[in-house]
Design a protein with these regions (language model features):
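PLP-dependent aminotransferase class I/II
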Residues: 219-296, 300-303
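N-terminal small-domain helix-loop-helix segment of the aminotransferase-like
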Residues: 2-93, 98
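Short hydrophobic alpha-helical segments of the AMP-binding
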Residues: 75, 124, 185
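PLP-dependent aminotransferase-like
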Residues: 102-158, 162
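Active-site pre-lysine segment of PLP-dependent enzymes
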Residues: 143-155, 168-191, 195-227
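Short beta-strands and strand-loop turn motifs
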Residues: 35-37, 131-135, 159-165, 191-195, ...
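Conserved PLP-binding catalytic core of the aspartate aminotransferase-like
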Residues: 138, 294-320
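Short acidic capping loops at alpha-helix termini that bridge into adjacent secondary structure
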Residues: 32, 82-86, 106-109, 156, ...
Length: 320
C-alpha cells in the first residue's frame, strides 16, 4: 500500500488530539474525568448562541452561504477592517492548510519555533515534505526566540509562523519585539501571527494583534478562532485577516460551503455575547491562578501562562 502513497504523507507523525471523555471513561473504567487536554472552554455557551443554533436547525437541508458573507462582514466591523480583509475557515486549522498550500512553492520553506503548534509541521510535511519545515530553538524560558528565528531566515524561507501566546508552553512575546521582528522580515516573506489565545492576555496594551500591520498593507496574516474563549470548539470556526491581495488568493483555494450554517450563525451570535467572553476570561484567570499555586505547592516547575492552560513538568516520566 505504501507504494501508492505520496511519500510526503509517509513522513508525517500524525496529530494526536485529546480523546473524548467517553473514550477515556471506557478505556480506563473511570466514572468522573476532568478533561484538560484540549484547552477547551468549560463554560456552557450563552443562551443567545443556543437560540441561534436552534433557529438554524430548520435550515440544515440547505447549503450554507459559501462566501460566509455576513460573518465576514461582522468580523471586519469587530476588528476595524474591511470585508475583503477577512476569510473564514472550518477552524483556523483549515486556514493554516490553505496558507501553506497556496504560498509555498517548490524548494521554499516554512519557519517557526520548536515546541509550538504541531499542525504547522504536519501540514508543511504533507504538502512539501519534512525538509521544507525549519525549527528555531526556543529561549530558556520557553518563549519564541525571535532572534533565533530571524537568524534562520534565508532566500528559501516563505512563511513564518509566530504563535502568540504559544501552544503548548503558554508563554507570550511582548509587543515591541514582535514589531521589531516584523520590520526585519524581508518583504517577500509572509508572517503569520497565530493569535488563538489572544483574549487571555493579561495586558492587551503590550500585545500585537497584527491589525495595524494589516492596515499598513504588510505581508502579515492574523489567525483567530472561536474554539477557545467563545466556546465553539465543536463547531469548527476560525478566520484569517490580511491585506486584500492575500485574502483574494486564499479564496481561490477555499473549499465551497466550508463552514456550516449552524457554525456561521453561532459565531455571529457569539460576537454579540461580550458578557460571556468576559466571564470566560475572568473564570479562566481565577482558576488558572489556583491551579498554578497548587501545582507549585507539589514542588513542580510550572510555566507562567497567558492562555487557558498550564505547562508543568512532572517528577516522573509520563510514559510510565
Amino acid at each position: 500500500m505504501e507504494s501508492l502513497v505520496n511519500p510526503h504523507v509517509l513522513q508525517i507523525t500524525p496529530y494526536k488530539p485529546g480523546k473524548p471523555v467517553e473514550d477515556l471513561q471506557r478505556e480506563f473504567n473511570l466514572k468522573k474525568i476532568v478533561k484538560l487536554a484540549s484547552n477547551e472552554n468549560m463554560l456552557p455557551i450563552p443562551e443567545r448562541v443556543r437560540n441561534a443554533i436552534d433557529e438554524e436547525l430548520s435550515q440544515v437541508h440547505l447549503y450554507p452561504d459559501s462566501d460566509n458573507h455576513y460573518l465576514r462582514q461582522r468580523l471586519a466591523e469587530y476588528n476595524g477592517l474591511q470585508l475583503d480583509n477577512v476569510i473564514v475557515g472550518a477552524g483556523s486549522v483549515e486556514i493554516i492548510h490553505m496558507l501553506i498550500r497556496t504560498f509555498l512553492k517548490s524548494g521554499e520553506k516554512v519557519l517557526s519555533s520548536e515546541k509550538t503548534f504541531s499542525l504547522y509541521k504536519i501540514t508543511t510535511t504533507e504538502i512539501a515534505g519534512e525538509s521544507a519545515y525549519v525549527e528555531a530553538p526556543m529561549s530558556q524560558d520557553l518563549c519564541f526566540d525571535l532572534q533565533a528565528i530571524a537568524c534562520k531566515i534565508d532566500p528559501q524561507t516563505k512563511i513564518i509562523f509566530i504563535t502568540n501566546p504559544n501552544n503548548p508552553t503558554g508563554t507570550f512575546i511582548h509587543a515591541q519585539p514582535i514589531r521589531d521582528f516584523i520590520e526585519r522580515v524581508p518583504s517577500d516573506k509572509i508572517v503569520v501571527l497565530d493569535n488563538a489565545y489572544q483574549e487571555y492576555i493579561d495586558n492587551p496594551d503590550d500585545y500585537v494583534t497584527g491589525l495595524d500591520e494589516i492596515r499598513q498593507k504588510k505581508n502579515v496574516v492574523v489567525l483567530r478562532t472561536f474554539s477557545k474563549v467563545y466556546g465553539l470548539a465543536g463547531l469548527r470556526v476560525g478566520y484569517a485577516m490580511a491585506k486584500p491581495e492575500i485574502i483574494a488568493i486564499l479564496n481561490r483555494v477555499k473549499a465551497p460551503f466550508n463552514v456550516t450554517r449552524i457554525s456561521q450563525r453561532a459565531a455571529l451570535a457569539s460576537l454579540e455575547s461580550e458578557d460571556y467572553k468576559n466571564e470566560s476570561v475572568r473564570m479562566n484567570r481565577a482558576n488558572k491562578a489556583k491551579l498554578f499555586s497548587q501545582l507549585q505547592s507539589l514542588g513542580l516547575r510550572v510555566i507562567p501562562s497567558q492562555t487557558n492552560f498550564l505547562l508543568f513538568f512532572p517528577k516522573m516520566d509520563v510514559a510510565e
